[in-house]
């Protein structure tokens, strides 16, 4: 089952599998990052969007359209509509090349009596890095490629910082992409990254770079994975305490 199928299956279970005593509210937003500019894909209006830090420490895009959705069909309809507004262009290697990064977000709120649970699912489609010598990009295509490559490089810097075992500064603010994904790369997040590669020999150098990036991503530990070393250390400490208590008991018996 591909990632897209898993995504729609999970949404179907979300809408149809909830208990009868749960009130569900789901809101969808969709934007692209084009030449370091945030563009709302759920409306034809072009207003300036900025990432702002909220009072709870999370980040949000002010002015971004959010659509309430109550079914999988509504989600699909908005996604298809938003996709038609995404920036595409042609170059020597691709007639319909994505010229932007896309972020589709679903904010979910579940209410049961006095309990409220909230969560967010971000689906991110990154534009591929481009070697200008192969794409033959000029003019607008050249500017777009430079912006894409710069933001992907910033994402690589963030991944490198997160992969380090010692705490260090993580350069989230180096691009709109990484700043917007800061919450998705936090300690509480669960992240799945899929890297697309080409089987063609002509693309071997790009494939090697993509695999190297995937290997760095594999070294990043977030959420439960990050907590594992602490849990293991706690277990060792408890075992040591039990061993010391047993030793004290034996010494006490010998003293009698």
Language model segments and positions:
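Long, amphipathic alpha-helical segments that form or neighbor coiled-coils/leucine zippers used
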Residues: 203-210, 214-245
């Amino acid at each position: 089952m591909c990632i897209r199928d898993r995504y729609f299956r999970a949404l179907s279970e979300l809408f149809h599998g909830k208990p009868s005593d749960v009130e569900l509210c789901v809101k969808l937003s969709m934007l692209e990052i084009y030449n370091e500019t945030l563009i709302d894909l759920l409306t034809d209006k072009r207003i300036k969007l900025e990432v702002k830090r909220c009072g709870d420490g999370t980040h949000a895009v002010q002015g971004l359209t959010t659509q309430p959705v109550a079914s999988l069909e509504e989600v699909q309809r908005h996604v298809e509509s938003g996709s038609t507004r995404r920036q595409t262009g042609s170059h020597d290697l691709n007639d319909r090349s994505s010229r932007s990064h896309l972020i589709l977000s679903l904010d979910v709120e579940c209410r049961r009596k006095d309990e409220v649970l909230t969560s967010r699912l971000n689906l991110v489609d990154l534009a591929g890095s481009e070697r200008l010598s192969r794409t033959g990009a000029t003019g607008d295509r050249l500017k777009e490629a430079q912006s894409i490559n710069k933001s992907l490089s910033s994402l690589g810097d963030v991944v490198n910082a997160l992969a380090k075992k010692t705490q260090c500064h993580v350069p989230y603010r180096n691009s709109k992409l990484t700043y917007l994904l800061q919450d998705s790369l936090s300690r509480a997040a669960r992240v799945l990254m899929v890297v697309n590669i080409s089987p063609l020999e002509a693309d071997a150098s790009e494939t090697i770079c993509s695999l190297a990036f995937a290997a760095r991503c594999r070294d990043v530990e977030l959420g439960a994975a990050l907590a594992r070393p602490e849990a293991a250390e706690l277990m060792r400490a408890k075992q040591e305490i039990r061993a010391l208590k047993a030793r004290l008991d034996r010494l006490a018996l010998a003293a009698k």
